[in-house]
A protein has these predicted regions:
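Conserved N-terminal subdomain of the carbohydrate kinase-like
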Residues: 32-113
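Glycine-rich phosphate/adenosyl-contacting loop at the front of the ribokinase-like
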Residues: 1-57
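Secondary-structure boundary/capping motif
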Residues: 44, 118-120
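Short glycine-rich, flexible loops that bind phosphorylated cofactors or substrates
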Residues: 7-8, 92, 117-118
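Short secondary-structure boundary/capping elements
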Residues: 1, 14-18, 64, 91-95, ...
Length: 120
């Protein structure tokens, strides 16, 4: 539960956000992985939902009126430097009834530290 976003690298974008990465890897180990987050009602948000679905991760990703989250990634001396943008969709995660049901059924929950900057 938490941020789902696009890491914008100099050579393209990569699906990111620790919680969705955790859900994917948990699923690879035989667990049920569920992504709970929010994306914007925009092309980047639709691409995130498609990408999460194509990876086989169950999703409870709500769509809201904020832009889909992105993180700018640049390399300085071979090391990544991140620009994390605020007031994006995952800053305002809507807990849908489906998401609440998945949380109640969960054996473990991974939540992102970035999402802790907002009330949800």
């Amino acid at each position: 539960m938490g941020e789902v976003l696009w890491d914008l690298l100099p050579d393209g974008k990569i699906l990111g956000g620790a919680p969705v990465n955790f859900a994917y890897h948990a699923m690879q180990l035989g667990a049920v992985g569920v992504a709970i987050s929010s994306v914007g009602d925009d092309e980047l948000g639709r691409e995130i939902i498609d990408s999460v679905n194509s990876k086989g991760v169950e999703n409870c990703i709500a769509v809201n009126n904020y832009p889909t989250g992105t993180v700018g990634v640049t390399l300085k001396d071979g090391k990544p430097d991140y620009t994390i943008y605020e007031n994006v969709a995952w800053d305002f995660i809507e807990l849908t009834s489906g998401a609440i049901q998945k949380l109640q059924q969960a054996d473990a929950i991974c939540f992102g530290t970035l999402a802790q900057r907002s009330a949800v």
